[in-house]
Amino acid sequence: MTNIRKSHPLMKIVNHSLIDLPAPSNISAWWNFGSLLGLCLGIQIVTGLFLAMHYTSDTLTAFSSVTHICRDVNYGWIIRYLHANGASMFFICLFLHVGRGIYYGSYTYSETWNIGILLLFAVMATAFMGYVLPWGQMSFWGATVITNLLSAIPYIGTDLVQWIWGGFSVDKATLTRFFAFHFILPFIIAALVMVHLLFLHETGSNNPTGIISDADKIPFHPYYTIKDALGFLLLITLLLTLVLFSPDLLGDPDNYTPANPLSTPPHIKPEWYFLFAYAILRSIPNKLGGVLALVLSIAILAVMPLLHTSKQRSMAFRPISQCLFWILVADLFTLTWIGGQPVEHPFIIIGQLASFLYFFLILILMPTCSLIENKLLKW
């Protein structure tokens, strides 16, 4: 008799995706972040669902409903902080996952890569809208500043902003629709994840060497299920350590002050995971230019497959490219630091130089360097 997991229509799909899936024998811990992102999404959906049961999306009661969750709901505080810090974990895994894709040339699977970029945009939109919901000072002013950027779009900008706001300022209508979108987007993200995996399983996984590994495959279970389980354990340990020992470490103290449209905080800044993009936005004095740079800072990932000039796929055997990659990582850390600083000397010029270097590295230096390495192969 055939095993049920190989014959049952539904079990068969799970079997081909998670059990009998042929996987390269040499994929390192950098390949763990895909499953960790799945775990993060699961944690966010479950904790978010429980928070939504007690949250009210009204400007008068939103802030106090979050306080009520933390004080009066059974284990409400841990659910709230798991959700808030779970978002940080989500972005740490996302950045490492994308970084792995760049380093090992996984972007050559262009369909999987492009769905991944869509996922990144969707997760960023979800996180932004979620940050508005507690209706603290930084929630309100963050929403005002970021949505106002759309007014830089010629001709339709002002109308577009008022349409998104549902009025002439960020108010009750804005909060209600942000809650609606924040609730629905994770399920859209889950659907996109399915498509992401569908395209990935069409080609199979890349590996650290960047060489086709069809001749040497191993079953996903038990080898990579146990490896993923270890990753899950480490992620949950890190998340719980953060939640139980310093839950507000990554938050902004301003968000413990209820939103006040009449008082602007001294430094308006987003959550830490948006600071690099915020620094790029601020580095350009022109409003429209800044908005374009902000969008391009993520959209630039889409041109990576087109800019791949190397004869080798992975950077594993390309020391000059490796050097440029780590300069790019250091540059992103610099941008993140600058994004959290006030707009004054010397931070302005450092931000402008770091923003220039970010685009210069990806668009010019890395492809040129790959061509030089191609020449060196012939020596």
UniProtKB/Swiss-Prot annotation:
It is found in: Mitochondrion inner membrane. Heme b b562 binds at residues 83, 182. Heme b b566 binds at residues 97, 196. One of its GO terms (cellular component) is respiratory chain complex III. CDD domains: cytochrome_b_C, Cytochrome_b_N. One of its GO terms (biological process) is mitochondrial electron transport, ubiquinol to cytochrome c. It is a multi-pass membrane protein. A ubiquinone binds at residue 201. The chain crosses the membrane at residues 33-53, 77-98, 113-133, 178-198, 226-246, 288-308, 320-340, 347-367. Keywords: Electron transport, Heme, Iron, Membrane, Metal-binding, Mitochondrion, Mitochondrion inner membrane, Respiratory chain, Transmembrane, Transmembrane helix, Transport, Ubiquinone. Its cofactor is heme b. GO terms for molecular function: metal ion binding; ubiquinol-cytochrome-c reductase activity. Binds 2 heme b groups non-covalently. Heme 1 (or BL or b562) is low-potential and absorbs at about 562 nm, and heme 2 (or BH or b566) is high-potential and absorbs at about 566 nm. The cytochrome bc1 complex contains 11 subunits: 3 respiratory subunits (MT-CYB, CYC1 and UQCRFS1), 2 core proteins (UQCRC1 and UQCRC2) and 6 low-molecular weight proteins (UQCRH/QCR6, UQCRB/QCR7, UQCRQ/QCR8, UQCR10/QCR9, UQCR11/QCR10 and a cleavage product of UQCRFS1). This cytochrome bc1 complex then forms a dimer. Belongs to the cytochrome b family. Component of the ubiquinol-cytochrome c reductase complex (complex III or cytochrome b-c1 complex) that is part of the mitochondrial respiratory chain. The b-c1 complex mediates electron transfer from ubiquinol to cytochrome c. Contributes to the generation of a proton gradient across the mitochondrial membrane that is then used for ATP synthesis. This is Cytochrome b. It comes from Ochotona thomasi (Thomas's pika).
